[in-house]
């Protein structure tokens, strides 16, 4: 199991954490919170029963810009488990030009191995730092030969208590950062990886070729002259890589991928067969993608470069706006594999007010922080926030409803002049009120033709 505290979070705690970043959509948050908690519950069961409990996959339905993708993004951070987000439109039926759906699981395995490798390196960090420190000191103060039979590798790892007085002094200076700008010459491992461009659908071949060239050049090193400040992170990374066991990492990562993996499939509605007459041209390929996804969701074995991954217990969360298609337009077998349906509601003016002010990294806080870097103290009055929310809701209603993304457009337009002039206004304070908002945006909002192209 992943070595994380978030694995034991209750559904209520998960929802509270999501509330810090996402406004509203309580039903969707509850659904993903319960699904996450069920992963933990399943792992507490006896092994015989554990294998019979399948994840309840989720289908999120709602217009664009209401928080579907943001929920997935925050969930990935929160779960600290193998997670991959893909767009259904990037995949095509087997035999067509495009990505094979099995690439989803290969990407998940890559993510899992990377996650576990980073965790393993964190565990050996202190030891790696000590080894890196010794290598830097060896470059600064080469050890004296101990005569016949002297083993330089054994000498390198002598206890620090046996260091001579000069070495102890240099070690203290090194830890205090007093030697950071001094240049040293070191043997540094060479990364023999090679970038290989492959056509769509042949990513696996590209990975295998990269691995082959990497193995051919493995173990090589070269002498480089670096400052101690630049050399230290390179040496720590290299020493940590020597200390971790790659076989153990791969075994644990594959198990985590199978037991805790989460796949988020966005824009699932774009591969649904649409009901209109005359739209059958692309339906064959769309239905083919669904049929290729079906074995992954039902449970199958996928070969990856780390080993075979069983997808039986991977949690799949799909989302789509379903403007032109309906969930019932998906093939029946795939519909049945997403038993939990959650509808996300369109955002209102009141939601926009909350989005602008409540989240931990709310848009207004972001702009205030950005302009503060130029020495401009920007503040938004409550009337300005209310007016901005009203304008965003109006434009969404009059034109295409793009949800909270409209706020980005409105705020960029509002602060266009101030952002341009900020370097010349160092030390000034600017308060944005409703009058300022109307002065900057009023004409655009009132003119439908202008707002269509600018807002």
UniProtKB/Swiss-Prot annotation:
SUPFAM superfamilies: P-loop containing nucleoside triphosphate hydrolases. InterPro entries: AAA+_ATPase, ATP-dep_Clp_protease_ClpX, ATPase_AAA_core, Clp_ATPase_C, HslU, P-loop_NTPase. One of its GO terms (biological process) is protein unfolding. It is found in: Cytoplasm. It holds the Pfam family AAA. Belongs to the ClpX chaperone family. HslU subfamily. Gene3D superfamilies: 1.10.8.60, DNA helicase RuvA subunit, C-terminal domain (1.10.8.10), P-loop containing nucleotide triphosphate hydrolases (3.40.50.300). ATPase subunit of a proteasome-like degradation complex; this subunit has chaperone activity. The binding of ATP and its subsequent hydrolysis by HslU are essential for unfolding of protein substrates subsequently hydrolyzed by HslV. HslU recognizes the N-terminal part of its protein substrates and unfolds these before they are guided to HslV for hydrolysis. Disulfide bonds: none annotated. GO terms for molecular function: ATP binding; ATP hydrolysis activity; peptidase activity; proteasome-activating activity. GO terms for cellular component: HslUV protease complex. ATP binds at residues 23, 65-70, 266, 333, 405. Its main location: cytoplasm. HAMAP family: HslU. PANTHER family: ATP-DEPENDENT CLP PROTEASE ATP-BINDING SUBUNIT CLPX-LIKE, MITOCHONDRIAL-RELATED, ATP-DEPENDENT PROTEASE ATPASE SUBUNIT HSLU. NCBIfam families: hslU, PRK05201.1. This is ATP-dependent protease ATPase subunit HslU.
